[in-house]
């Protein structure tokens, strides 16, 4: 039998995430990390429209199927976590860590495989980075991610409570790392010992392809350090956000973004003049594992 506590977070999660979103939106307005290059009135309607599609796909498809998988494995004692007789708190903690690790791999796959990137690229095409970018995804990416989520939950043997807690942590961390929020440098360095922070994730949204190939972690930053994809020493003032081949206004309207995965694509990582953005080693001070201003 599944304990009643497994559904305890369900009513709390949406309200808590709305509070996190509004708090980050307020803070990033007062303490911006990077100067905006586009007016909000041009970006936010597009971002909110894409977010609506993401929320619909998540509520109608991803979460029901992932929850169903979590109930199935809990009832049948199936999955990796069930191979060891762990106390419930330890099983929850290990489950959260393993879900985050496997999501790191999934994020990398969305960059590595071109068919997946055609959808995931919609997220990276945002010419500025703020909390509204956090859910700016193509609904198609959310739909095909359902298969990954069900396999992740099923093979790991994640129970409903652990799944819901990770889902809440994932969404909150996603908003935090995308926020255009200037934290005091010492505070961000301290937080970044464990968590992905705005400066860290901002590098992942750079127009420099080498930097996009770094910092894939979602909640815990350890996975980038473990897989040698961690890069922190890029000054935020030098970062241009977006994808160089798709920075013009016509590329960031709603309909072109919806049909982007279906169209013949030009080279994502070249400017219009055919050159590729690069950053010289002299422009990245200090060690790659230490955040700079």
Could you describe each region identified by the protein language model?
Residues 225, 236-293:
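Cytosolic-facing loops and C-terminal tails of multi-pass membrane proteins
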Residues 25-44:
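Membrane-interface helix-loop junction between the first two transmembrane segments
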